[in-house]
């Protein structure tokens, strides 16, 4: 990869992906795009940025041509809970945007990445150590989008030879950008509330285990997969990916190592709880590890320490300004 265009660059993943890619490949070699302008304090501000509605194919093609991109990372999407509230919009944005991005990759011979998700699984999927190849019958519009997206990526690889690469992300946890619209968002919100209020009310019930990953590991995985030897990759629809599996009570106990008085209670959101119940408790990542060397560095304990320290530092800086 030498010239990279990233859609959805102001999202939770996109923001940190832009920063890391600019560190590695050079600021001027990474074009960030999103449907709105970045805020004044956004780290995306320090390099090339263009407005892009991913449902506008002509505009997407124009940006790819003008930037002379050789790689496209398509991150723009509505997340699970938001998509469930707006299923028509979710289909139009998630699928229309992906089709435009894949067509751009086909037309301009781009290396292509787009994320899938554990949301691609459903009630009939094996819940524990979910295999790489298994039943995928999701019960949400977001999940339907992700399964369709996986199949499209596989189709474009087999039919047109497009170098498509993807991973099924678990819940992603980061202190850089507060979340919005995801079922796993509780696992981010809980850290901010622990530092700022000493209490959190979880919309996901105790005993609900979901796969998670610290954002640094997720960004590293994207770059590692994109740089991997093409000949070693046997999966083109989406690699299973995870670093840990936990429920809200386990996060509470990890936080209490640093904030002993932290408390947790529950006000379960039936929509997001229903989504969570349809997802695996844990997934098998052996294909990712074997084919391109996926090796996450962070577990719950080390992630908790970093999250709390980063939020404390962020709030200290904000209060001193």
Curated annotation (Swiss-Prot):
GO terms, molecular function: L-threonine 3-dehydrogenase activity
Protein name in UniProt: Uncharacterized epimerase/dehydratase SAOUHSC_00535
Higher taxonomy: Bacteria, Bacillati, Bacillota, Bacilli, Bacillales
PANTHER family: L-THREONINE 3-DEHYDROGENASE, L-THREONINE 3-DEHYDROGENASE, MITOCHONDRIAL
Entries under SUPFAM superfamilies matching the protein: NAD(P)-binding Rossmann-fold domains
Record family assignment: Belongs to the NAD(P)-dependent epimerase/dehydratase family.
InterPro entries documented for this protein: Epimerase_deHydtase, NAD(P)-bd_dom_sf, NAD(P)_epim/dehydratase
Pfam families on file: Epimerase
Gene Ontology biological-process annotations: threonine catabolic process
Tree of life domain: Bacteria
Gene3D superfamilies with a match to the protein in the record: NAD(P)-binding Rossmann-like Domain
């Amino acid at each position: 990869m030498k010239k990279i265009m990233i859609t959805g660059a102001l999202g939770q993943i996109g923001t940190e992906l832009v920063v890391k890619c600019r560190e590695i490949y050079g600021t001027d070699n990474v074009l960030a795009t999103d449907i709105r302008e970045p805020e004044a304090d956004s780290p995306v501000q320090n390099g090339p940025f263009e407005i892009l509605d991913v449902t506008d194919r002509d505009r997407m093609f124009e940006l790819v041509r003008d930037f002379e991109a050789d790689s496209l990372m398509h991150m723009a999407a509505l997340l699970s809970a938001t998509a469930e509230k707006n299923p028509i919009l979710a289909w139009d944005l998630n699928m229309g945007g992906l089709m435009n991005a894949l067509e751009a990759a086909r037309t301009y011979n781009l290396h292509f990445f787009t994320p899938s998700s554990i949301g691609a699984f459903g009630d009939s999927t094996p819940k524990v150590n979910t295999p790489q190849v298994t039943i995928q019958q999701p019960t949400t519009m977001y999940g339907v989008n992700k399964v369709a997206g996986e199949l499209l990526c596989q189709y474009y690889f087999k039919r047109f030879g497009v170098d498509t690469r993807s991973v099924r992300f678990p819940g992603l946890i980061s202190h850089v950008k507060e979340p919005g619209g995801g079922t796993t968002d509780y696992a981010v919100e809980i850290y901010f509330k622990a530092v700022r209020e000493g209490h959190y009310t979880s919309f996901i019930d105790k005993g609900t285990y979901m796969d998670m990953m610290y954002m640094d590991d997720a960004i590293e995985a994207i770059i590692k997969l994109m740089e991997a030897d093409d000949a070693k990759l046997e999966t083109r629809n989406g690699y299973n990916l995870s670093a840990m599996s936990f429920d809200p009570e386990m996060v509470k106990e990890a936080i209490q190592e640093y904030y002993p008085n932290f408390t947790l209670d529950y006000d379960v959101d039936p929509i997001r709880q229903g989504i969570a119940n349809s997802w695996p408790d844990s997934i098998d990542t052996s294909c990712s590890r074997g084919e391109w060397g996926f090796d996450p560095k962070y577990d719950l304990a080390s992630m908790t320490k970093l999250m709390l320290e980063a939020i404390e530092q962020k709030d200290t800086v904000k209060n001193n300004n």
